[in-house]
């Protein structure tokens, strides 16, 4: 389960060289902030660390060094504070798309590639990404040619995540509390004093 190709020069994970040794390769689609392994969090830590080690560098300088190391520029990110504002549509369209495409091309066989998707939480300690970001990741990855993914919720799926994923993978979930209900979201009668929802649908 390697990190996305942007980290390959620094982690020594060569997609082309590892492809013959594995039946499947699961590129980590980890883009959250804070915690560990997430792209935003990693870039933030490196910018902060470079600034601490080199007090004469401005934040702009530190971002420029990290961008040079990784060969990537985050759309809409000019400062550490910008990382707190979440991911732009352009981030998904450019960064997620390009990283997925690079993994697919490096491995050379889309049937061997399964995107390992997570949106923060435990065990990584990252800021939870909203369902719209999950949708952005999945849509951009699919547009780049990814055929399969594995979603790693921690600890449980929420209703919005399940609805988004089911809409991409066959039959859209029927959000009916009397049927399947994701454990990561309380049923409607759990937060209204136990009153049953009216039979309107």
Where are these regions (language model features)?
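Glycan-processing catalytic domains of CAZymes
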Residues: 1-201
